[in-house]
Amino acid sequence: MVKKVLLINGPNLNLLGTREPEKYGTTTLKDIEMEAHQQVAKHQDAELFTYQNNTEGFIIDRIQEAKQQGVGFIIINAGAYTHTSVGIRDALLGTAIPFIEVHITNVHQREPFRHHSYLSDKAIAVIAGLGVYGYTAAIEYALNY
């Protein structure tokens, strides 16, 4: 049986590599996705889907589609929606697909409004502050889940 993993990136993550490189580094989202596909390709029984959107409703739609596709694990960096979106939280809960929340920076070292996540209490794990390596760690976990 093929393990299907969905990697979702939210608003402004399409700007990685150029957006505040002192915080987020110079690695682009395309680089992250390419590395993720290479990592998953080492496992013959795994498939990776990647998705990025700046619009909350489209992210919710993609989470709901994941259930229909038989996705068994979601890795999500919801970006700013982490701190505001009950809708994304409800979509994740509604599909009952296990997920890991990933953040490139340590959100707890940043502005106070970034300290609260609508996702973390329901996530299997939260990875924050490891830079883009957080995606690698999350994928490794998902593949062995």
Curated annotation (Swiss-Prot):
GO terms for biological process: 3,4-dihydroxybenzoate biosynthetic process; quinate catabolic process. Keywords: Lyase, Quinate metabolism. GO terms for molecular function: 3-dehydroquinate dehydratase activity. PROSITE patterns: DEHYDROQUINASE_II (PS01029). Its EC number is 4.2.1.10. It catalyses: 3-dehydroquinate = 3-dehydroshikimate + H2O. The record marks 19 as: Transition state stabilizer. The keyword Nucleotide-binding does not apply. CDD domains: DHQase_II (cd00466). Pathway: Aromatic compound metabolism; 3,4-dihydroxybenzoate biosynthesis; 3,4-dihydroxybenzoate from 3-dehydroquinate: step 1/2. InterPro entries: DHquinase_II, DHquinase_II_CS, DHquinase_II_sf. Substrate binds at residues 77, 83, 90, 104-105, 114. The keyword Lyase applies. The active site is at 24 (proton acceptor), 103 (proton donor). It is an enzyme of class 4 (lyase). Is involved in the catabolism of quinate. Allows the utilization of quinate as carbon source via the beta-ketoadipate pathway. Belongs to the type-II 3-dehydroquinase family. PANTHER family: CATABOLIC 3-DEHYDROQUINASE. This is Catabolic 3-dehydroquinase. The lineage of its organism: Eukaryota, Fungi, Dikarya, Ascomycota, Saccharomycotina.
